[in-house]
Amino acid sequence: MPALRSRTVTHGRNMAGARALLRATGVAREDFGKPIVAVANSYTQFVPGHVHLREVADVVADAVRAAGGVPREFNTIAVDDGIAMGHGGMLYSLPSRELIADAVEYMVNAHCADALVCVSNCDKITPGMLLAALRLNIPTVFVSGGPMEAGKVTVVNGTATTVRKLDLINPMIASADENVSEQELNALEEAACPTCGSCSGMFTANSMNCLTEAIGLALPGNGTVLATHTARKKLYEEAGRVVVEAARRYYEKDDESVLPLSIATPAAFANAMALDVAMGGSTNTILHLLAAATEAGVDFGLDDIDALSRRVPCLCKVAPNSDKYHIEDVHRAGGIPAIMGELARAGLVDTSLPMVHGMTVGEYVDAWDIASPNVRPEAVELFHAAPGGQRSTEAFSQSTRWDSLDLDRESGCIRSVKHAYTKDGGLAVLKGNLAPDGAVVKTAGVDEELWTFSGPAKVFESQEEAVDGILNKAVQPGDVVVIRYEGPKGGPGMQEMLYPTSFLKGRGLGKVCALITDGRFSGGTSGLSIGHASPEAAAGGDIALVEDGDIITIDIPNRSITLEVPEDELNARRERLLKELGGFRPRNRQRPVSAALRAYAAMATSASTGAARDVSQVERTHLHS
């Protein structure tokens, strides 16, 4: 039977100093011997998804204490991708994932914590904490801050007024539309983000919080209960109770089934990806799941994702893939248990797998899917939680309820497999000479008439250069915009291309152009936007050899992406490039890169493996220097 890790610092004569310090933090004599639960909070006033988490961690801590554990809270950093977008700050977003993982590892191991609650929410925080949880492999529960309410705006059109829902992406697109007045833009800006919480569409943050629920490390409702709703308080209380129970099962009963590596198995990764494909989640989720699989030592790669995308249909289209639905609507339709229920009934997920709350996937669906004949009353109650319609930066600030649930599986927010939006899933992996190791596209956000596309390349050496080109009308209808040297090493940091895609839409080019990059996309991106092209330009990928005017052909049904240039010409270009530049680097790009970012680039791997860190790259260099 494993001993409590915390005994290292709470027991033995020689640990008197450690106990003295713990006493100074409020730990009493009778607490020594109880499981110490690290509460990894990510509260910050910079990020709307995290601005309310100070109070949230207190609720978790109180629940841990009531269940017989000793809570110890600490903080991690949290980068807001939306604020960091469109300037040099975006270079730091993806690298922050590794910093967060390291910070959690450092704190938990330095203080010998027995279990972990991850209070996360936004884009890189949940993935960073997931990497740490898999690395540490101690009893862990994830509980996020919850999604933001969708914005609502009154649009004046002559004498008529209509109210429509919107989110962060709307003012971004409008800012590039010359037909939108400053007054209209200001109205959109003020209405887009009305409350605390992760941005209201199926963007990266909400996608990842839904996936932690599907993979089995979070509680029912984690991905969809609104940040402002009182119903979310029960989630935090339950997280505190469950983590102490999991710690007891492991340390007192030697039950390894509660450990992250026992839950996040290859089959669990497949379940999570099936959900992702079904709901048309952010392409960033592919990056993070691949990195998590690498951390867990799980054999799960792009080929597995490609196979799932061909087998699992798209059951849910939420902003930015649809103007009609946001996360609050997914919640009204039953949230993640409802989507998992539809997949389970079609035999598309493994229902035998364990989850941290003690149920199998099948039991979770049976109890929490509102379409199940055995649904629990508390599940029905939970999914009635609705937006409050008032500006708020506080957790638990409203308790509005829907008057009815969305049970329409034919044309509602969540559809059955029989009535799916498309028989293929909402994400796809493309391969070809332009991306032999793979590239990814969110098909749920692409109109089907664009699933095959061919056009001349318009090449840019950076995101900034591309933005200038789009706004200055250098990009024309039919072009394939190529943005390169923005990969994990080439950026470094693999910037998101939300501004280029938003500005293409703002200029009316969103449905007549394609965009390909070795960088990545925000979860708010839609349109024919293909990212993660691997190998990246900085690693010698053929994307470095594309020239203006080259024809690029995209064929989503056949999962191909082809640079229509003969191989001998590509080889000649490669030789010329190496002779001219001495390596694969952008021409005439002026970009300050700090030592911290250079350190990240030195250890970053390809997007095809999740841009996971590989320390051996540095170790090999050191050994051979």
Swiss-Prot record:
Cite the annotated pathway: Amino-acid biosynthesis; L-isoleucine biosynthesis; L-isoleucine from 2-oxobutanoate: step 3/4; Amino-acid biosynthesis; L-valine biosynthesis; L-valine from pyruvate: step 3/4
> A GO BP term, please?
L-valine biosynthetic process
Chain residues that bind Mg(2+): 81, 123-124, 496
Work out whether the entry's keyword set contains ATP-binding: no
Cystine crosslinks: none
Q: Does the keyword Lyase apply?
A: yes
Return any one Pfam family short name: ILVD_EDD_N
Briefly, what is this protein's role? Functions in the biosynthesis of branched-chain amino acids. Catalyzes the dehydration of (2R,3R)-2,3-dihydroxy-3-methylpentanoate (2,3-dihydroxy-3-methylvalerate) into 2-oxo-3-methylpentanoate (2-oxo-3-methylvalerate) and of (2R)-2,3-dihydroxy-3-methylbutanoate (2,3-dihydroxyisovalerate) into 2-oxo-3-methylbutanoate (2-oxoisovalerate), the penultimate precursor to L-isoleucine and L-valine, respectively.
The similarity annotation says: Belongs to the IlvD/Edd family.
Know the name of this protein?
Dihydroxy-acid dehydratase
Naturally occurring in which organism (per UniProt) = Thermobifida fusca (strain YX)
Gene, per the UniProt record: ilvD
